[in-house]
Amino acid sequence: MRILPLSSDSMGARSMATFVETKDLRIMIDPGVALGPSRYGLPPHPKEWERMEAHWREIVRQAHKADLLIVTHYHYDHHNPWEGLEIYEGKRVLVKDPKRNINQSQRGRASFFLKQIEGIANVEIADGRSFREGDTIIEFSEPVFHGTNSKLGYVIEVFIREGEDSFLFTSDVEGPSLDDQARFVLEKKPKVVMVDGPMTYMLGYRYSRASLDASIRNLSSILDAVETLVIDHHLLRDLEWSKRIESVLNKGREVKKKVITSNELVDKPLEMLEAKRKELYELYPVDESEMREWKFED
């Protein structure tokens, strides 16, 4: 099994887009990428725009090779309903249920996206289901909260197994801070798990200390069940990310388990462009007329 992160916050843009290849299938999970609308009162720096656009080109390139595409929920850093829709043409597309366990915002986005690919893709609801192709098994969790409650909607987690190899993609659980989000990981015991991590860049605002503490407990439990913990996305928007989960990193070293970020999985440098936005504007000044806003919330 080959696991290839194509875009991530550790690589400079908001995304968890991941390409997984087995002997039987080439799978594209969450083909989307976005930018943080505002950090430190600043819009995305031109270098962030450049990175996002480069990542999107790579996502499209790899998605063309895919036999199967998966959309775990309908935030714009996980799917793109406007561009590159040809990647879905003639493909099997497994999606989060657009009508059940979904909030109003995602319901509208899901409807729009599915109309965009209607007639060109073979769309199936994935929630709680299992699929098999040869020796490759794909299992989906029941919907779990995007975060600590239903305000941001629900996501589905993805487990892929091929023989002795296995990979689990939590999508946006923001931790996981809830037991039912962690349960799917603990039950499946994947060799490699990719987690979006606690949303510590909003600690004390939209993410509580109690949620962080619960996430650390769950991540520690997950370490007992896996060989490699890949943590990225929400956590990697915080320059202090490693301090926030120091106990998890320490445990990983103690029990000889890998705790890494997505960039390390593909031997790329850590480039937290959004978290370093203020620094980017200081190092590479931009005239106000050249600033571009990202107008969409995730």
Swiss-Prot record:
GO terms for molecular function: hydrolase activity. SUPFAM superfamilies: Metallo-hydrolase/oxidoreductase. InterPro entries: RibonucZ/Hydroxyglut_hydro, UPF0173_UPF0282_UlaG_hydrolase, UPF0282_hydrls. It comes from the Archaea. NCBIfam families: PRK04286.1-1. PANTHER family: UPF0173 METAL-DEPENDENT HYDROLASE MJ1163-RELATED, UPF0282 PROTEIN MJ1629. Belongs to the UPF0282 family. HAMAP family: UPF0282 (MF_01406). This is UPF0282 protein Kcr_0286. It comes from Korarchaeum cryptofilum (strain OPF8). The lineage of its organism: Archaea, Thermoproteota, Candidatus Korarchaeia, Candidatus Korarchaeales, Candidatus Korarchaeaceae.
